[in-house]
Amino acid sequence: NKCDDRITRRVYLSKEKEVSIKVVYFINNVAAHNNTIEIPQTVNGGYDFSHLSLKGIVIKDEDLSNSNFAGCRLQNAIFQDCNMYKTNFYYAIMEKILFDNCILDDSNFAQIKMADGTLNACSAMHVQFYNAAMNRANIKNTFLDYSNFYMAYMAEVNLYKVIAPYVNLFKADLSFSKLDLINFEHADLSRVNLNKAILQNINLIDSKLFCTWLTNTFLEMVICTGSNMANVNFNNANLSNCHFNCSILTKACMFNTRLYRVNFDEASVQGMGISILRGEENIPIDSDTLVTLQKFFEEDCTSHTGMSQTEDNINAVAMKITADIMQHAD
């Protein structure tokens, strides 16, 4: 068959081969008379796909642990039910790639360029995503414990039912993103850009959001108990049923902000700038009296502090969020 960019073939892998495997599919850098290439094994027992340009490959139920895809160009590729432990994708380019029910723990996705990629029902713990470009990525039903997204560009990403305690998102860009049913407990979201994002059912207990940008952001049922949110920017945001009790909000900004049933009990609010939108009226509030204005907020229905939310109540809500995330997890 001629080597045509419209031709896609399934990749066949077999760990029973001692030295190498044969892969039959379209590869840009294979001569027109031969679209079969042998993929050598790496020193760690995986396969070396490095710097190949692969289109339309489908790999199912294979052991690709310790394989090397560094510098690869992967277009419309599918990896399903694969063990990809410690796989290297450093500097790979991915277009509409799908990882479905794969083990990606301890893998390297640093400095990848991914567009419209999907991680579904994957285990991606301790993975390096630093400086990765993952715009419009779709990550759902996935474990991201302890993974590193330092300075990752993830604009317009969709995160749904994700377990990600201790994840590092320092200086990441998640603007215009949608996050729902996420466990970010003990995570670092400092200096993260969440402008114009939608956050719903988020557990951020004991997390860091120092100097994080949340302008024009919608937050509903976001629990930040005991979190460090100093210098965070909520300007023009809309907050509903959120909990900031026992958190540090020193020098935080909440100008032109709409608040409904927001809990600031025992929060540190020194130097906080806040003005609440009530209809078209913008009402400035002294941060020193913020927590004591319960009656005003109840009647105004703009915000509600002192909601009789005990620590046990709030922990129960956080546990329910985690339980909802885990409902369909294996």
Task: State where each predicted segment sits.
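Tandem repeat scaffolds
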Residues: 2-3, 7-8, 12-17, 24-329
